[in-house]
Amino acid sequence: MKSIKYRGYRRTISEYTKRASSLPTVHETTEINITGLREFCKENDVTLTAVIIKVLASVQKKHPLSNSFIARNIFLRKTIYLPDEVDMAVAIEMHAFDSHFSTIVVLRDINRKTVREIGSEIDGLRHLTYTQLPLSGLTTLMDRLPDFMKSIGLGIVSQIPALRQRLFGTMGFSSLGKYGLKSFDTLFYLNVGYGIGGIEEKVILKDGSVQTVPTLTITQTSDHRIVDGAEAARILAEIKRIFESGEYKTILKV
């Protein structure tokens, strides 16, 4: 029987996902007609991923709870913090140590970046090695610690607002549509995370005629301690409206 070492990075992932899975989450899914969006991306030579990230970040202005987290204040009381910046934690797949695994990189201050800058940053990060990623020194140190010290370290970081935002980000993004998945739930130690599924051609009835349109499925996972089900639904409905109404064109800086 073949065996694989349970390396430090796997143990770090384990500690992170333990904390993420402990959150009381609510999951909501919507399908979005992206006919206009697909044409927009082609005409402007921008990636769909970068456009989606930019739009998700923009929703924070109308729904600030979509970009928030719980940590301790100076009196050690739990407090909901609402950062001014949207720091998007993006899950990417890495190959290192003879293994494939997911890791998280944080894109800083999304609302200040253009779609092309976001796309270029993601593309650049995907071509880096594990040890070249931002904050790789800290993650390498975490990988070397015993499990109980990893748990203590993550616990301390999660309760200090500035450190939490810097290391974990404020909003999560994962895209697995290219593997044929329609929808999936994300596992981020964050208040809100988005799972982007694949694009499907769907038949709809519009203006008395049958039409085929491309649809994209987005699943939103929210921390129920901060975002109630109704508010989560409003956030997701706003995202759908922006995409289908074409309002994203006024939001995006190409």
Where on the chain are the PLM-derived regions?
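C-terminal catalytic/motor cores of large multi-domain enzyme assemblies
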Residues: M1-V254
